Amino acid sequence: MVLKWNRVLLASAILAALSVTACDAQPSATQKAAWDRNFYWGTATAGYQVEGDAPDSNWRRYVDRTAGKPVTPDSDPLGAGPVDPYKQAVDFRHRYHEDIANAHAMGVNTFRLGIEWARVMPEPGRWDERELAYYDDVLATLRKNGMTPMITLMHWVYPGWIADRGGFMNNVGAFEEFATAITKRYAGQGVLWVSINEPLAFGAMEVRTGAIKPDQFDAFLDRVADAHRAVYRAAHAADPDAKVTTNEAYISPEVLAQFVGLGVKGIEGSFFDRVEDSLDYLGFDYYTGTAEDNPASAQSMTARWNTKLQAEDIYHVARHYSQQYPGLPIYVVENGMVTDNGKPRSDRVTRSQYLEDTVFWLQRAKADGIPIIGYNYWSLVDNYEWGSYRPRFGLYTVDALGDPGLKRVPTDAVATYAQITRDGGTVPGYRPALPAAHCSTTVGKDSCEPLDPNGPLAELK
């Protein structure tokens, strides 16, 4: 029972955190030549979460095993209820032209997607040419629409045959074979590479699904670091100008303290410390933080729909990373706001308001010398959030369970994002709609001093 409880606490604590000195801000001439854009405005998806037609994988097996069955701590650490059937997700596999067109209409110039290892390599050593052609066409469609592809190579899903051989932890060599082939295939196309999505959360998901035990967490992160370095080597061998990162989901010290005491090792510091020598840019994800009036103890998974939002803390997190890892450009790979099945939040904050406030504070960060080069909104469309369609993050909302047509319905944030990408930020004179938290503790007490909303702002373009 102790082991099971520790597993639930570990997965819940990490996943709860996820749902919920100035320098020259201008890049040098050499840096400008190395990057295709002055600023990357993006939106994001992930293969398994949106594609449909799911091939055999660790996650398909988990969902097939648990969907629709009575809730247990192992099957529902997120507090979202029974595992939903996967069905066809939102069918990006057949509707990517529509989704890319919607992204293009908002003016975004970057599109994050995943290439699913399980889809393109369904058996050891066998490549599925039809599925590779599908990804070729997705990238060609992005290029026709003037977008930079950001490709994630591991977003927690791997082939069933890898699961049969001991899971990701024991098959980094096979992952390197996959990564080498994909980075070579798309070399020279201006791709921004993300090796492994949110390594800490990846470990939590492996615990959740029974692939690893809590006492294997530190060793698992070591293997993920090995995998990241393999991607870095492969991408740079194929293209010396390649740009590679891994995206860390920022978790506040207050939240980490809740489960460090469980005996789990490897989470005390940043994952970037393990791979600092193999990063071309630093990607992080931020959703919400902690404060004296928003303590971690109140941020349970069951309350996440109404957890206080702290848009201003994206500034503190960006500053923290710029100070810890000077010299690396910083990209917000994921940021967004969750709602409960699309219902209005109890605080009445809208997706548009949270987006505007977040961008406002990124403009402030840039003006204060923090080298922000890009921002992705998570997500373009509602998707399958690891066992549930209940959490909604999409700029376009989709009723995956109730609407056979999977209609994309724009939220209020679509028009807002179009204005932001056009103008390089919020409208002149905009001031944040959300009240700042009282004494933020998101990056420790150094973020307690409130930011002045009347400070300088930079255009992000």
Model-predicted regions and their roles:
Residues 91-116:
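Catalytic domains of carbohydrate-active enzymes, especially glycoside hydrolases
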Residues 19-22:
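C-terminal motif of bacterial Sec signal peptides marking the signal peptidase cleavage site
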Residues 81-94:
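Active-site mouth loops of central-metabolism enzymes
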Residues 115-127:
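Glycine-rich, proline-tolerant flexible connector loops at the mouths of alpha/beta enzymes
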Residues 2-10:
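Bacterial N-terminal signal peptides that target proteins for export
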Residues 28-73, 122-124, 133-346, 355-460:
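Active-site region of glycoside hydrolase catalytic domains
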